[in-house]
């Protein structure tokens, strides 16, 4: 009887030890691709025109949102710092340019050249965002072996092209939330785990100052993505 009791206790302790040392499968290098939808918003300060026939005239500007599909690729590594805490490091690149958005410039009460007619608003230039990349850290909370809830804190950079072919590099902070879950083992040529993920991100880009007028504009991007990734064993 004593032998059986000791054996049961030994097995119980062993089971607890194994459970205590079980590690999240997300503690590893990862690669992933995702598709989603992004809304790019512009904001303008307005100002005064400093060049040409309309020098000294105040203006205002607006632009509609640019709504686009996104197709991103990312890679990185996650470290298990505590049984309940993972810290990921990652880099991401968006493979699809945003749709263009036309600025509308208004200089009320004026008439004249090709840009401003009868004091009304005229489409002036269009903008498009591309070469969009980011680096980030991703603190996460593992749920068992196969699930992970995470946040993203990072820094994003992109090019904003105008209609005349010039561009400005704009950068800003990135924040996001997401969820990952292992959905299959993979053991063919290479070994690892396939996982699915969903995430939402927000980026606030810095100001871009205009060249022929005072004032500036800024952009912000909100996106949601779904995708698949691979955890390398």
Where are these regions (language model features)?
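Cleavable N-terminal export/targeting peptides
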Residues: 1-27, 233
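Gram-negative outer-membrane beta-barrel domains
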Residues: 21-233
């Amino acid at each position: 009887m004593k032998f059986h009791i000791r054996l049961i206790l030994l097995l119980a302790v062993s089971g607890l030890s194994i459970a205590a040392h079980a590690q999240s499968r997300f503690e590893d290098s990862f690669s992933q691709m995702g598709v989603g939808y992004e809304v790019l918003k512009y904001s303008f300060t307005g100002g005064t025109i400093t060049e040409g026939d309309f020098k000294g005239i105040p203006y205002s500007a607006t632009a509609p949102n640019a709504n686009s599909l996104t197709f991103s690729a990312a890679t990185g590594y996650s470290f298990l710092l505590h049984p309940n805490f993972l810290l990921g490091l990652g880099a991401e690149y968006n493979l699809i340019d945003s749709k263009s958005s036309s600025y509308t410039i208004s200089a009320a009460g004026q008439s004249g050249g090709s840009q401003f007619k009868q004091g009304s608003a005229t489409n002036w230039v269009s903008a498009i965002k591309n070469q969009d990349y980011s680096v980030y850290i991703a603190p996460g909370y593992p749920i068992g072996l196969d699930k992970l809830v995470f946040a993203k804190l990072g820094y994003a950079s992109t090019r904003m092209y105008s209609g005349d072919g010039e561009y400005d590099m704009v950068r800003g902070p990135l924040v996001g939330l997401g969820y990952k879950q292992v959905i299959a083992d993979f053991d063919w040529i290479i070994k690892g785990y396939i996982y699915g993920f969903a995430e939402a991100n927000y980026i606030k880009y810095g100001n871009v100052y205009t060249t022929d007028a005072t004032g500036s504009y800024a952009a912000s991007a909100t996106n949601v993505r779904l995708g698949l990734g691979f955890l390398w064993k």
